[in-house]
């Protein structure tokens, strides 16, 4: 876990974000953020987005509509402060007070084969999203010793 925490620290530093939570993909980062926020209103997404985004909305039973608009680098899931920044790799590029989701898929600038991260602004967001990444478990203690209260 030491390597993961160091990776999170370096990604947060690169983007100048207070915190970064490592995930297994940008899609799962977005899903965790949607579960965390549980928006009730219809979410607006660009018509030309990656197919996993509307599939995630369907999976979570969240209403969404497509908007035919151009975007570059990143876009907001309108109605939330969640940002799909899967193709955005910019030093100092964190948008304050957002949950900014990154991708490290094999065709991205930082190509790790697979992976993602959530940039966030508070310790509370970091702590909860980190636990959600591990199915409600903390990463610093054996699961048998934990009182799991959060669902990932």
Residue ranges and their predicted role:
Residues 1-5, 137:
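A glycine-/small-polar-enriched, mobile loop at the entrance of the PLP active site in fold-type I
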Residues 5-43, 53-59, 66:
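Phosphate-binding glycine-rich loop
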Residues 17-19, 69-71, 106:
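Short, acidic/glycine-rich phosphate-metal binding loop used to engage nucleotide
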Residues 18, 40-41, 79, 98, ...:
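Short coil/turn segments at beta-strand junctions that form active-site/ligand-binding loops
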Residues 27, 50-51, 123-126:
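Alpha-helix N-cap/helix-start and coil->helix boundary motif
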Residues 35-92:
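PLP-dependent aminotransferase-like
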Residues 89-91, 96-152:
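Active-site region of PLP-dependent enzymes
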